[in-house]
Amino acid sequence: MKTNQLFLLTGLAAVTLPACVQKDKKGVSEKPMNILYIMCDDHSYQTISAYDHRFIETPNIDRIANEGVRFTNSFVANSLSGPSRACLLTGKHSHKNGFTDNTKRFDGSQQTFPKLLQQAGYQTAVVGKWHLTSDPTGFDYWNILIGQGDYYNPYFIDNGEKKQIEGYATNITTDLALDWLDNKRDKNKPFCLLLHHKAPHRTWMPDTCDLDLYEDVVYPVPETFYDKYEGRIAASEQEMNIIKDMDLVYDLKMADKENEIHTTTGLEENGRNLYNRMTPAQKAAWDKHYDPIIKKFKEQKLTGKALAEWKYQQYMHDYMRVIHSVDRNVGRVLDYMEKSGLLENTIIVYTSDQGFYMGEHGWFDKRFMYEESFRTPLIIRYPAKIKTGSECTALVQNIDYAPTYLDIAGIEKPDYMVGTSLVPLFGGETPRDWREYLYYHYYDYPAIHMVRRHDGVRDSRYKLIHFYGEKNEHNDAINCNELYDLQSDPNELNNLYDNPEYADIQTRLQARLDKFRVDQKVDEY
């Protein structure tokens, strides 16, 4: 596959990389594949119709699945925005890449797949949400949101220069990506573009043109919405409950002009500031939609179950409107790729930095190793290698993305990357030596939502989770385990740990967890 070698120095070590001319198995030169990686923030697999039709139709995202492969057992290594992105870039678990929680600063001097692609002749770019504190490295072009970014009139940092752009973040991010593809890149080089949307991150603010969508839809309340968390100590301590922790003003847009609606979460002022940053035209559209909802809400004086389910419906309506905008913009990108002749020579990936709760267990947000958070969508279109409309059930994780992109470019995976290239799965078969277990580790505690630190392992059917932590001003010490049979208990309600009937399974998973900790030199658990 290699035609010549580029000898480059990275730090003190020389590494050998192939130039960007590849050969097929017959020795005929083939044009290197471009890479387009589209990642949203907190896009649940439940709200992509290629996975689930209960909530919304996403025809443009589905197009990628229909013309490629849908991974049904795709997971993350740490279900939190910054750490997940660090895992993506490095192919390493959080304790190895140094970005364990959102208080950290990503060490941009470490090796990443964009750097290796860049050194091999690719032109690299990242547009949209970065959320790693330090400036991007390994990119010829970067234009990123500051921190979490804002939905309306956000500030971007364009290769070091701060600029505010009027408009809606999802549209702007797409505009910037298409502008780079069309006008700012060297079209003689293969490219790798990371297109990172802020959406649908909290606070789920829809585009003004989408505000009235789904108004008459009543979303089914999850069967676990009123979960009591029996046998699950950490789950009972969290602060991400729609009923208790979702703010009426910040999250649900009840910023009334009379200033009569007040909340106790400390987020009310932030919610009003989100409205105040809008232009007069944006405010007018916003008021036209939300003022009648606010008026009716104040008149109803809801309490108890009625208030809980009103909050759920309001949350779901706004989340789906934001997803509608994402899907529309994915369509814009696909249309451009097709019209510009790039579609067939570009591998297109759609994913999220982690999963998200759509009311399951009464929650919003992510963080836990439970399925809705741990699992993430992954869809790949690669016409030359992947059968259209296919499905892959192998266990995959976001630490696999970096090795995959290197493999596609003909670059040997560095030894430090613990992820595995997904390319062997593209043919439709799972290799016999493919992994049987995944390792997960969450560190961000004490912090917003108060989810305890934990690690664990999952195989194709069972999951073992270990929660740990010393006593602090917020909670008592915790040292407990949870075991789930995902086949008989997909909602993870029945903790089977120390159940004699599952002793052999518990022993097997514990041995695998211990091995991961030793092999990967895990520093806390």
Which residues fall in each region the model found?
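Formylglycine-dependent sulfatase
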Residues: K2-C480, P490-Y525
